[in-house]
From Swiss-Prot:
The gene is Tmem54. It is a multi-pass membrane protein. The chain crosses the membrane at residues 22-42, 62-82, 94-114, 155-175. Pfam families: BCLP. This is Transmembrane protein 54. It is found in: Membrane. InterPro entries: Beta-casein-like. It comes from Rattus norvegicus (Rat). GO terms for cellular component: membrane.
Amino acid sequence: MCLRIGGLNVDEFRKLLMKTGLVLVVLGHVSFIAAAVLHGTMLRFVATTRDAVVLQYCVVDILSVTSAIVVILAGISAVILSRYLPSTPLRWTVFSLSVACALLSLTCALGLLASIAVTFATKGRALLAPCTFENTELPTLAPDCPFDPTRIYSSSLCLWAISLIFCLAESMSAVRCAQLVHRLLELRPWWGKSCHHTIQASPEPLDGHDLLSCTS
């Protein structure tokens, strides 16, 4: 008889789950800030224009914000679960949020990649829609332009690249979190051991108590 979860004892499993949750919280906040900065520096000016490319930019930004919020919620839930492992409803909540995070973050990454590709293909013309220039190939400062047109192209690509990296990191962390909770739920086909719970019914923290009893 052993007191282990996926090769880890209960304390190690709790620490690993808490670290994974904290990573998700940090990544979610950074992604949210990046999406907010992108909206404040670029999208709020071009969102009023009727253009398919601009619409795609806005949809991806909204998706980024939504994904960041879900990631933060999943991270907080994982941290709470690390203290209340016996709670079955909380396990399912964290597992569902983690799967949703992985899918949303991956979708967001694909959308950001598409935005970068479209911007390169169009040379950022959609970003300059609110401004009027005699020569769009050589944009200069104009009194009727609400932003610096000489920097909008590079700034947008930089923010999209940063968001893309964090979305990929969120997706991998969410998958890791889902795998950890998957072990607690004993779901097939990845559960390799026959385990029997000795978890107390109350969701209170059980420091120093055995949570799982496994037999190979």
